[in-house]
Amino acid sequence: MSQLVYFSSSSENTQRFIERLGLPAVRIPLNERERIQVDEPYILIVPSYGGGGTAGAVPRPVIRFLNDEHNRALLRGVIASGNRNFGEAYGRAGDVIAQKCGVPWLYSFELMGTQSDIENVRKGVTEFWQRQPQNA
């Protein structure tokens, strides 16, 4: 199975979700000076920011990470977290990334997710990678 790459702000909601998920994952650093480059296909797990619009929905460190053509080329899907208080903007970062990068938006969960979200993502990620061609 390929990896997960995620971003978590200082609130650590996404970090806690990843810890509960128990799958291999690499964190996009908060520090602008730190960069990572992936070397295998991955699914991105990202929180949504902003108060409802498209602008600002994707965290800046995630934009920097995806602006690296190598990292962007290995992206295979996106999972978004959000806050349902933002209505239609819930999980907006997933929609923005899926559209701009041409990958499927696989799932969304609220804040740090429920046990059901953990189980759904764990199962969904496993099944997603099983359906992918070996050289994808």
Swiss-Prot record:
Example of a GO MF term: FMN binding
SS bond list: none
InterPro entries: Flavoprotein-like_sf (IPR029039), RNR_Ib_NrdI_bac (IPR020852), RNR_NrdI (IPR004465)
Gene3D superfamilies xref list: 3.40.50.360
A GO BP annotation: protein modification process
Pfam families, alphabetized: Flavodoxin_NdrI
Function: Probably involved in ribonucleotide reductase function.
Entry's family note: Belongs to the NrdI family.
HAMAP family for the chain: NrdI
Entries under PANTHER family matching the protein: PROTEIN NRDI
Protein's recorded name: Protein NrdI
Taxonomic path: Bacteria, Pseudomonadati, Pseudomonadota, Gammaproteobacteria, Enterobacterales
Gene assigned in the entry: nrdI
